[in-house]
Amino acid sequence: MELLANILRPEKLSDVIGQSHLVGDGKVISNLIHNKVLFSVILYGPPGTGKTSIASAIVHELNMTYRTLNAVVNKKEDFDIVIEEAKMNGLMILVIDEIHRMNKDKQDILLPYLESGLITIIGLTTSNPYHSINPAIRSRCQIFELKPLSTDDIIIGLKKGIQKLEDITIDDDTIKVIASYSNGDLRSALNLLEVCYYSSSDKKVTKEVVTSVNGKVPLFADKNDSGYYDTISAFQKSIRGSDVDAALYYLAVLLEAGDLDIIFRRMS
């Protein structure tokens, strides 16, 4: 069975969800593709934010020969095969997943072909490339950061997924609950939706089904609601006011909600 996240993989940049600072009218990646020009790029950001989706859309819109390798799984010989194919057939795009794990041997064989333009790479990573990728590779790539998706973006993606699930019954509140579990990760949200759908005997996905599959109900069903921001504000005010008990209380609430990023930002 093909996963819902793979079924929904876009073939056009206009179908990419979120990342409006990179894709859309007048945005840098969309402009490059519109002009039929691509430089080697590294897309980095948290899981499920659209790195693979953007790479997929790029190669389909440019209609160029491409291959996909994983820097961990694929061996040096696999990279050699791609290079030989490019030598015979001409320009090629090489999508490299987990590019931050690419060892020196693989980097060394690629560098001359990046220099010549025979191979253009699209590197995908969850790690900050400024810290994790060899400068020799990094200096030959344009680096784009992807942001966690908003709750609204996740809901858009879930609704696209729902259209692919036959005879599903689900209400808007349940969709929001699934989105709230995702932490900006659309793939995670789609996987949860799919598990809930197939684990329900009548194809009815309710909040109770979601909770039984994924555990406790999140404290905030929607991180765009006022309660979430009121808690963040109260946490910061209690720190500024040196109210230890209140700060610890609101810290515990945010920890329970699972939002570590916002805690780090407020405490740094």
Please give the residue ranges for each predicted region.
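A short, basic N-terminal segment
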Residues: 1-35
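Walker A/P-loop
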Residues: 2, 31-69, 84-85, 111-116
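Short glycine-rich substrate-engagement loop in P-loop NTPases that contacts/grips substrate
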Residues: 23-27, 64-93, 104
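A short helix-turn-beta junction within AAA+ P-loop NTPase domains corresponding to the substrate/partner-engaging
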Residues: 64, 134-148
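Conserved AAA+ ATPase "SRH/arginine-finger" region at the nucleotide-binding site
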Residues: 70-72, 142-155
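Conserved catalytic/switch belt of AAA+ P-loop NTPases
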Residues: 104-139
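C-terminal helical "lid" of AAA+/P-loop NTPase domains
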Residues: 176-181, 187-201, 209-215, 233-237, ...
